[in-house]
Structures are given as structure tokens and as C-alpha cells.
């Protein structure tokens, strides 16, 4: 029988408890049980077992406050990830079994370090620091494409084949290091874990072989090119990281510790970039990326010092192009909202609207004028001089949407009913997830402000969220907002059920079962909503069965 991963993880915990920081109790990591992973004759971790392992890791990670669901940033992340995933499918990099059984789910981590990491089961962690540091959407796609290729090429499972016993210890140490990194957010702790476990890991990442790194580079760059991103993004990112690591050795780049840059990797990326076709600048989302970099910076470090620095930068009258200026204003406004300094936030949003209007006028003027180059004569020789005016590209429509959403955040922060209503109106008929969540937050804000229209807004939010969760039952934030909107309407049973579903979506089955039992108790008191009551009974049975099945898996893991 091959050693079970749970046993090795428990042994690793005992060996590693010396390195746990005081703020994080040792027992918090000693309780990590992992599913059984099959027999010794298996050549590698099966896809089913890989998904089980990934699900168990995510059950430990999701409840941590460092894992955030910011609808605006997450939608931007998915706007890069989804084309990469689709391109990998088209190229045949993802087998039908992988596509069906793996999660293909990225998640955001509130951490200023430049890092992204692939996990078993098709999960991918993305630090806000990576988004903030990426100079373009293409550079961001290069990192995600690289990590996606670690998943599609099954590098974790293949690494375990090389030396089964040692790789299991490595994986156990990896999981402990990952959990300690996310929960303690102390870079020294996971490195101590890595050393003691003899795992080539950094903040939750496997250090893959040079061959696998080269493979992930090549597959990742091909995938990002097929997805419509500029292949030069990977070479540009490598150059940016090379310069940064040379000038700054402050451990802010853990991705480099587990993905060491070599001359060969950089040269290969540059060669592939030269062979690819240049991207149309109109499709590069330059301004939207500037806004999302600023949002990542504001959310990854919410200290007063960091936020006031962003606020001050937005007030500086320095020459910037429109994309940079809009990014700076967006970051300054968001920082002001976080500081509850609403007057500067409103002023910065208004200035951004002026910049957008002026830019649109310039684009329109350019379109009206002849596209032919201006020809003039040289003063001395009379020879013709061709003057080509640089083309000005229209700002992406997503930018106006992002500022409209920011205006809603600012109005909700003020808790002014009329201002909230005016801000929500700027969203128009936007049915995206960020707009849906913003309307729900606005309805809750109206209720807090005792706005007379709050009841109608809450009911509309409940109906919209109920439709959304029917199609997206794993959306924790949507369930949470549904509970918060239903409660003030007196829909107690619906609110309790939504709270339970939020717990279940996070993997907290005990918490979900507890809330559903509270719902059953409420129905026995005579406050009946027969539809919700029947759903609660059914879901309670389902989750109890799921918990029993999970318990059997963990029992098998502990008793090989």
C-alpha cells in the first residue's frame, strides 16, 4: 500500500509545529485531513483523486479573510482567465476528463507579493500583488497562462511519479506551507515549513523541474497567443521581474523563488514573442488594466499610510497619458472611499468623467478629419514632409462601467438614499455580476439610511439574487447578500437558508447544517413559508449525506 497523504500530512504537522507563529495556533494546521489517494501501482495521481485533494485544500482556504471576492476585480481576472481556458481547450491541452472533473477556478488572495500558484484539482490562487505589478493585460495573461499550463499538463501529478514517497512528503509540506502562508501571511513561516519538510516550495507552490517550467512557458505562451493576447507579454513580464529582483531583494517576488528565471527561459520567451503576430493596440484594454491595477493596489494594502499615498498621487498635477491619469484617479477615489473621505472621492470620479469626455471628443475629431497624413514643405529645400498624427484609440466601454460601479461604492459609503439612487441609475441595464452585487449593496445601504424606497429596492435585489444563485449555486457572496436583503423584509426563513448555502459553498458543512436546523426550528414555531421549508428539509438531508461521505473519505485516509 502506498502511504496515505493524510498520514504524511499529520506527520508533517507534528514536525512543523515549531515554526507556527504565535498568532496562529499549531492545532489550526494539525487538523488538516486529506482524502486517500489510491494504491502504489497507480502511475500518478488520478484526476478524481486530484479533484478530491483540491476540494479539501479549498475547504481549508476559502473561509480565510485573505481569500477575497471583489466582484469588479474577479470579473477582470475571469476576463483574462476564460479566454486562456477556452484556448487551451481548442488546442487539445485539456482532455475531456480534465474539463469535466477539474474545477478551473481561480481565486483572489489579498497579498501584496507578486505571486500566482496552481493547486491540485484545477484551482489557481492569484495574489492582488501580481495584478498590481503586471504592466499590461498581456503580462497578466502570461502568468495565468503559465499556471494554467501547470494544471493542464498535470505537473503536480507528474512530479509525484518521479519519487512517490518523497513526493508525498513534498505534497504534505506544500499543503501545510500553503495554509500557513494564506492564514498567517508571514513569508518567513512558509519558508521554514518548506525547509523542514524538504519540499521545494514557496508560499504554497511546487517548484517544478526545469523541464516542466520550460513546458509551462511554451504551452502558456502558445495558449495566450491563441486566446488573443500579445505573445510579447511573457517576455515583457520576465524582463520586468528580472529587473525588479535585481534591484529589490525584499522577498516580494515569491513567484521567482519557485519559478527561477534562467537565461534560457527569458531567451526562449523572447524568441517565441518575435515569431508571433503583433496585437492590435485597440484590443489591449490599456485603460481598463490601469484601473484594475489601481484597484488591486488599494485593496491589497488597506493601511492608512498606503491609502493616503494613493490619494495624494491622484491629487498631483503631473503629466500623464489619459489611461494613466484615469488609473490614478480611480485608485485615489477608491482609497478615499476606504478612508471614508467621500468629498475627494466624488471630486476624483467627476474629474475622471471629464477626462473620458475629452478623450472621446479627441477620438471623434480624429475620425472626422482625413485619415491621410498631413504633407508640408521643408522651409529650406521645399521637399515634402509627411507628418503622421499618432492614432488615438477609444477608451474601452468597461472603463465607464467601472467608474459607475465606483460611484455606487461612494454613495453607499455615504449612506445617502438620494445619492445611492442616482448612482445606481448610472448602471443602466448592466446585468453583469458586479452590477448585480452593487445593486444589492445599494439596497442594503438604502435600508441603513432609512430611505423610503428601500423596501422596493430590497425586494428587487432579492428576486435578482434568487435568479442568480439558481444558476450559480456556489456563489458565496451572492448568497450572503441575499440573506442580508431578505432579513429586513421579514423573509426570515429565506435569509436563514441563504446563510446556510453561503456556508455550504465555502465548504463549511457544519455551519450550513447548523443554519438549516435553525430554519427547521423556525418552521416548527408556526412561521411557515412552505416552499422554503421544504427546500430547507431537502437541503439538510443532502448536506448531512455529503458530510457522512466526506467523513468516510477522511476515515479511509487516516486508516489505510
Where are these regions (language model features)?
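Active-site His/Glu-centered metal-binding helix of metallohydrolases
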Residues: 57, 144-156, 219
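Catalytic Zn2+-binding segment of zinc metalloproteases
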Residues: 135-139, 148-165, 183
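Acidic/histidine metal-binding catalytic segments
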Residues: 160-172, 189-192, 228-238
Amino acid at each position: 500500500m502506498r502511504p496515505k497523504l493524510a498520514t504524511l500530512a499529520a506527520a508533517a504537522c507534528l514536525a512543523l509545529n515549531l515554526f507556527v507563529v504565535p498568532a496562529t495556533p499549531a492545532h489550526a494546521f494539525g487538523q488538516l485531513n486529506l482524502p486517500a489517494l489510491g494504491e502504489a501501482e497507480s502511475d500518478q495521481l488520478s484526476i478524481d483523486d486530484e479533484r478530491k485533494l483540491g476540494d479539501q485544500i479549498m475547504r481549508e482556504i476559502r473561509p480565510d479573510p485573505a481569500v477575497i471576492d471583489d466582484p469588479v476585480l474577479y470579473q477582470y481576472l475571469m476576463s483574462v482567465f476564460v479566454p486562456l481556458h477556452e484556448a487551451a481547450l481548442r488546442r487539445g491541452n485539456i482532455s475531456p476528463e480534465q474539463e469535466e472533473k477539474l474545477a478551473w477556478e481561480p481565486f483572489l488572495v489579498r497579498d501584496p507579493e507578486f505571486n500566482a500558484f496552481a493547486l491540485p484539482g484545477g484551482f489557481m490562487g492569484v495574489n492582488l500583488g501580481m495584478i498590481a505589478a503586471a504592466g499590461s493585460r498581456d503580462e497578466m495573461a502570461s502568468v495565468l497562462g503559465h499556471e494554467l499550463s501547470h494544471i493542464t499538463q498535470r505537473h503536480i501529478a507528474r512530479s509525484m511519479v518521479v519519487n512517490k514517497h518523497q513526493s508525498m512528503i513534498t505534497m504534505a509540506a506544500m499543503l501545510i506551507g500553503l495554509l500557513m502562508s494564506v492564514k498567517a501571511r508571514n513569508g518567513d513561516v512558509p519558508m521554514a515549513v518548506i525547509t523542514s519538510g524538504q519540499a521545494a516550495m514557496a508560499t504554497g507552490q511546487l517548484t517544478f523541474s526545469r523541464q516542466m517550467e520550460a513546458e509551462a512557458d511554451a504551452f502558456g505562451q502558445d495558449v495566450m497567443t491563441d486566446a488573443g493576447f500579445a505573445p510579447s507579454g511573457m517576455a515583457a513580464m520576465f524582463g520586468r521581474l528580472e529587473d525588479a529582483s535585481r534591484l529589490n531583494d525584499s522577498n516580494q517576488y515569491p513567484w521567482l523563488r519557485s519559478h527561477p528565471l534562467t537565461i534560457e527561459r527569458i531567451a526562449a520567451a523572447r524568441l517565441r514573442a518575435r515569431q508571433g503576430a503583433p496585437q492590435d493596440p485597440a484590443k489591449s484594454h490599456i485603460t481598463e488594466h490601469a484601473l484594475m491595477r489601481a484597484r488591486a493596489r488599494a485593496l491589497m494594502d488597506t493601511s492608512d499610510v498606503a491609502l493616503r499615498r494613493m490619494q495624494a498621487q491622484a491629487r498631483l498635477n503631473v503629466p500623464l497619458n489619459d489611461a494613466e491619469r484615469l488609473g490614478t484617479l480611480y485608485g485615489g477615489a477608491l482609497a478615499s472611499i476606504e478612508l471614508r473621505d467621500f468629498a475627494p472621492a466624488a471630486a476624483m470620479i467627476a474629474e475622471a468623467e471629464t477626462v473620458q469626455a475629452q478623450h472621446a471628443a479627441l477620438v471623434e475629431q480624429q475620425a472626422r478629419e482625413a485619415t491621410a497624413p498631413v504633407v508640408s514643405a521643408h522651409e529650406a529645400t521645399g521637399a515634402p514632409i509627411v507628418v503622421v498624427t499618432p492614432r488615438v484609440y477609444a477608451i474601452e466601454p468597461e472603463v465607464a462601467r467601472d467608474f459607475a460601479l465606483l460611484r455606487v461604492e461612494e454613495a453607499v459609503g455615504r449612506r445617502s438614499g438620494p445619492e445611492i439612487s442616482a448612482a445606481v441609475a448610472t448602471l443602466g441595464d448592466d446585468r453583469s455580476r458586479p452590477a448585480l452585487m452593487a445593486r444589492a449593496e445599494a439596497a442594503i445601504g438604502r435600508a441603513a439610511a432609512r430611505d423610503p424606497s428601500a423596501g422596493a429596492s430590497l425586494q428587487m435585489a432579492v428576486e435578482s439574487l434568487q435568479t442568480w444563485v439558481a444558476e450559480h449555486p456556489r456563489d458565496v457572496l451572492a448568497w450572503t447578500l441575499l440573506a442580508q436583503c431578505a432579513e429586513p423584509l421579514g423573509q426570515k426563513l429565506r435569509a436563514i437558508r441563504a446563510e446556510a448555502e453561503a456556508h455550504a459553498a465555502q465548504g463549511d458543512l457544519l455551519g450550513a447544517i447548523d443554519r438549516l436546523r435553525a430554519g427547521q426550528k423556525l418552521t416548527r414555531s408556526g412561521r411557515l413559508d412552505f416552499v422554503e421549508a421544504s427546500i430547507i428539509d431537502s437541503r439538510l438531508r443532502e448536506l448531512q449525506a455529503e458530510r457522512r461521505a466526506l467523513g468516510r473519505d477522511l476515515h479511509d485516509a487516516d486508516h489505510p
